[in-house]
Amino acid sequence: MAWQQLHLQCEKDNVDLAEALLLEAGALSIALDDAGDQPLFEPLPGESPLWDEVILTGLFDATIETGTRDVIEQLSHEIAAQVQASRSWVSAVDDKDWEREWMSNYKPIECANDLWIVPNWLTPPNPEATNIIMDPGLAFGTGYHATTRLCLDWLTEQDLTDKVVIDYGCGSGILGIAALLLGARHVYAVDIDPQAVLATNQNAARNSVDNRLQAFLPEDFTAFWQQQNIAPVAVMVANILAKPLIGLAPYFVTLMAPKSRIVLAGLIESQTEQVTEAYQPYFALDPKHAFTAQEDQHWQRLSGTFTG
């Protein structure tokens, strides 16, 4: 299979917007690199410092219409203008080169409260911790991205004991698997990408929770839900993008039990108000706010309690 890479060089303040635009355009993964020679000191757990000038590289499937060279060239000009990129370019990469580069970029990380994400080809640094063994493949969700970490942090704060959870936009399955390892009874994982469904099932097996997780494409999940007459769930996790989050609000509430909890991520600061407006009619205020908004750089996390 052939791939196209879109490279953008921009200031760190524009990185979150660039990531959001690349994902919205269909990027399968995004890597960040230093555009100069600026050193970064070892970060604290959960921190993700950035260089002043950053090169973002988005990976696109060149075998589909939205990933052809001409399309990606045009996309590079459009996104570069929006993020004030100092330069942009497109390159091709084959499977073997990408696999080598991809594996070398990952190491175990502690995300929250003794919860570790460990690539499946490495050994957990702390065998006594809660270790999620991951091979994300080409599905989104490695634990390195701010939106994933925001959701993982939220999950560790919830009482998930014997709860049924929906992980909508599951990517690699990392959030659903984390929920199971933190005490959930069962997880329904949903994603529009067949590769994500495959990766989720494989990662669930790696963590010995495949008997408690079912992964679906959206249309298959809807049919399954209706045919099996599934009871409303106690927890909903949706780490996708602002536009689909807004459109899915009325659908999500049909899947949720009264007083169930929801967390939403994948939106940047400028999108928070619109997403809040879409969900606030259905969700009660948290202790001090309608939603808890937690900022990791410019990415936002919203959470609330269903009143239906």
From Swiss-Prot:
Example GO molecular function: protein-lysine N-methyltransferase activity
Top-rank taxon: Bacteria
Main location: cytoplasm
EC number: 2.1.1.-
Gene Ontology CC entries for this record: cytoplasm
CDD domains associated with the record: AdoMet_MTases
One biological process term in Gene Ontology: methylation
Keywords of this entry: Cytoplasm, Methyltransferase, S-adenosyl-L-methionine, Transferase
UniProt: S-adenosyl-L-methionine binding residues: 148, 169, 191, 239
Subcellular location: Cytoplasm
Gene3D superfamilies the record matches: Vaccinia Virus protein VP39
Protein name: Ribosomal protein L11 methyltransferase
Lineage: Bacteria, Pseudomonadati, Pseudomonadota, Gammaproteobacteria, Moraxellales
